[in-house]
């Protein structure tokens, strides 16, 4: 039961969700198995049930900028099975993105950041317990909650008064995205008062991998947009959401680059990507290797997007139905600094993976696989630049 994981202390305003490795769902459902459940939610994990119930509660309380019900969805004809969804309200009502001009841009306390969110937007904070069997425990383990209060920003010489929850060490805050892309859309962030810029860290990457394993739903996705890759807030966070549709990229074929690291290259897709694969048993080393790549891209001032999803082992071939592992796709791309939003969709983590939140009815009606590919190609690195980057990354990872 999800209630066994949640602890709300009398003095706290935010609940804790405690978990351990015993809660990971290593044997994921295939999409065929998922469809057999239809509307039956008994397959969901305690994490799924807790997250979804809290998210729906906050939707019913009117804490989002717009209600998100059943989005009009269609699968585009073609070999790539793009999932297009009409989400007009997000394009109209979302918060104006921060002015970004560099992948290495420092945190700015004067811009909007997550120290300024409403306390009611917090779902819970997640704490990894060292207890081996969190599910069977009568007591939820984890750090205590300080509650809401005023604190100083902890980022070097930056000073900012902020009204936020101070997380104990090792916790991750789960906050609703008030302009949701899909059902269950939340943000995962380390202690906001650390005031970290939008540059991926090993700890947050590790949590992203763990969160996918905590979910029993094959459609639970986690992602990251770098600065210049359509990150709208320069304050460290991941996106998490449910998309109840199979994506081509979950089982697409790949070429091994560093087999010893499960590092591959996907080229049979409009947006070539670097791919890490794990069966879930080596999460820490996988997170470290992923951040070696993203740190390399940051150092080279290359914008990037990252998408974490359950998927098949790339060594088993194209089109496998198995979803027992995790695929992490990383796209290096042209930066979007000052880009005008003139296309049917922005090209960020969802769109590169094959999920297309479309801004208006006209584009939704007319969109085709070919038009999607044209839009995406305009955001990619030149072929020779990408080829050289691939060679440089392999050399760097093998040092």
UniProtKB/Swiss-Prot annotation:
Any single GO CC term annotated in Swiss-Prot or TrEMBL for this entry: cytoplasm
Known EC number: 2.7.7.78
Transmembrane segments: none
Subcellular location: Cytoplasm
Active site, renumbered: 237
Any one of the GO BP annotations: glucose metabolic process
Gene Ontology terms for molecular function: GDP-D-glucose phosphorylase activity; guanyl-nucleotide exchange factor activity; hydrolase activity; nucleotide binding
This protein's record includes keyword Nucleotide-binding: yes
Sorted UniProt keywords: Cytoplasm, Guanine-nucleotide releasing factor, Hydrolase, Nucleotide-binding, Nucleotidyltransferase, Transferase
Catalysed reaction equations from the record: GDP-alpha-D-glucose + phosphate = alpha-D-glucose 1-phosphate + GDP + H(+)
Coiled coil region boundaries: none
Family: Belongs to the GDPGP1 family.
Role description: Specific and highly efficient GDP-D-glucose phosphorylase regulating the levels of GDP-D-glucose in cells.
Protein name in the entry: GDP-D-glucose phosphorylase 1
Gene: gdpgp1
